Amino acid sequence: IMKRLSKSLAVGLLTVSMALASTAEACTNFLVTKGASKDGSTFITYAADSHTLYGELYYRRAATFPKGTMFTVIDWDSGRPLGQIEQVEHTYSVVGNMNEHQLAISETTYGGRPELEGQGVIDYGSLIYIALQRSKSAREAIQVMTDLVQEYGYYSSGESFTIADPREVWVMEMIGKGVGVKGAVWVAVRIPDDCISAHANQAR
């Protein structure tokens, strides 16, 4: 009887630990507007509860490119090339998830209906870093991101993006239109000044 109980207990604990591990590998964003912070700064957090992301801090140097240069998009999750897009003439310096103009972008994944996952060229991670290299403000980043998926297609599942500059903080949600349909469905909302917000793997 004790052996059976021990085996059942072990199986139960393993099941619970696997469920907890699955739940823990998630992302959380906290958003603070300038009117809600003590010193008038905007700031956002990006907690990715996954050991595979510990210690990663990318540096992308500002650069100038000749007209006609192409940029290869690499899927952030798998490392697989997805295709090429036209490079802009000048890109900004990016450290981690913030660029030289204090524009910062983070995300949490909410997934959504699987039939809406697209087959485009740009995944959610690449969308973040390309926008940081090409934008000076949150509003410009939203324009860049939505223009890119409209032209080249959106590869990922549903995402909530946090986009902040020294003046404004925004949340933008995006999901694909499905197989064979280029572009994405998206909505962007500015967090009112003097307010805070948060999202963690759930669509609004």
Could you tell me what each predicted segment is?
Residues 27-124, 144-204:
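A contiguous strand-loop segment
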Residues 1-11:
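Bacterial N-terminal signal peptides that target proteins for export
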Residues 11-19:
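Bacterial N-terminal signal peptides
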Residues 117-118, 126-135:
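Second-shell loop/turn segments in exported
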Residues 20-26:
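Sec/Tat signal peptide C-region and signal peptidase I cleavage site
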Residues 37, 132-138, 156:
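Cysteine-dependent hydrolase recognition
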